[in-house]
Design a protein with these regions (language model features):
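Iron-sulfur cluster-binding cysteine motifs and their immediate structural context
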Residues: 31-38, 116, 125-144, 155-168
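Redox cofactor-anchoring modules in respiratory/redox and cofactor-processing assemblies
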Residues: 2-113, 118
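Generic detector of short, aliphatic-rich beta-strand segments that form the cores of beta-sheets
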Residues: 1-4, 165-167
């Protein structure tokens, strides 16, 4: 059997995923479900994109309770549950996303970066495999990743034979 969640699972992104699904399934008849889930999803997308703001957690909690109480059907009444549950048990992940601009699981691309350590031998393998030419450096010298060009695909890390690329 395989685990559905582990330390590489971002709970904020998981809540966003489930809320996106329930929003898509909403019939749209009641405002709480139709508009409320849309607003919650916008906040979660902002947080996972590294644009979370002070007050987002409280706003998510407030919207979640109003949606639960005001929705007319089971879907709307349960739609906020993944957000409420992850806030209850993994609140620190939300706080890390918002205040530290960090995804502990390393899965929210906007909140991660790849860096080349001093273990780099200058073999150029990472640069050759980078699809956007974000890595530069001379043969046998430490290479550098241009963060403004990096698309965070991880190919550099996968191809480095020296373990010289870190995901932060």
């Amino acid at each position: 059997s395989s685990d559905l969640m582990d330390e590489d699972t971002c709970m904020v992104d998981m809540a966003r995923y489930f809320l996106n699904f329930t929003r898509d399934e909403s019939c749209g008849k009641c405002n709480y479900c139709r508009i409320g889930t849309k607003r919650m999803l916008e906040i979660l997308e902002r947080i996972t994109n590294g644009e979370g703001q002070d007050g987002d957690i409280e706003l998510l909690e407030e919207l979640a309770m109003k949606i639960k109480d005001g929705s007319m059907c089971g879907l709307g009444q349960t739609a906020p549950n993944p957000v409420l549950t992850t806030l209850k048990y993994f609140r620190n992940e939300y706080e890390d996303h918002i205040y530290k601009k960090k995804c502990t699981a390393g899965s929210c691309k906007a909140l991660i970066s790849y860096t080349i350590t001093d273990d780099c031998k200058g073999c150029t393998l990472c640069a050759k495999h980078c699809p956007v030419d974000a890595i530069s450096g001379k043969v046998k010298e430490k290479h550098v990743i241009d963060q403004s060009l990096c698309i965070k695909c991880g190919k550099c890390m996968d191809t480095c034979n020296f373990g010289a690329i870190e995901k932060k």
